[in-house]
Amino acid sequence: IAAGAPDGQSGETPELDEKPAPLQNKYAEAMMQYIRQHYAEHISLTDLSQQLNISCTHLNAKFKAETGYTFHDFLNYYRIRRAVELQKRGERKLYEIAELVGFSDYKYFNKVYKKYTGYSPNVIFPRGDEQ
């Protein structure tokens, strides 16, 4: 995944299954763990800010300062990375994959997928009739 992928401070994006290095900021670390565990659910920065008892603005700023990503950029990027993994298995249709990784709107999934990969999901892994 290359096109619009956020690349953090190091210039590289870690593999999803790698054990990430602990973040220095406890809020950023908590956000990263929460996203990795709950990416398929409806989650929002507001939910996290309430759980961590910090304002959305400060929480997002701390996350971006530590990771190079905004909350929404990382969440969408992580979801698309998971979608690509599921596509490679070839066991599900694209609309099913979209739902499994947390997108309730298939058209929005396509838009975000293209943003982060540079391609439509149908171009990379054609599956015939997807809907």
What are these regions (language model features)?
Residues 5, 13, 19-21, 120, ...:
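Intrinsic-disorder/low-complexity coil detector
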Residues 13-43, 49-52, 76-92:
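A short, Lys/Arg-enriched amphipathic alpha-helix from helix-turn-helix/homeodomain DNA-binding modules
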Residues 126-131:
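Generic C-terminal helix-cap and adjacent flexible tail
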Residues 34-38, 42-78, 98-124:
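Basic/polar phosphate-binding segments, predominantly the helix-turn-helix DNA-binding elements
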Residues 1-15, 58-60:
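An amphipathic alpha-helical interaction segment
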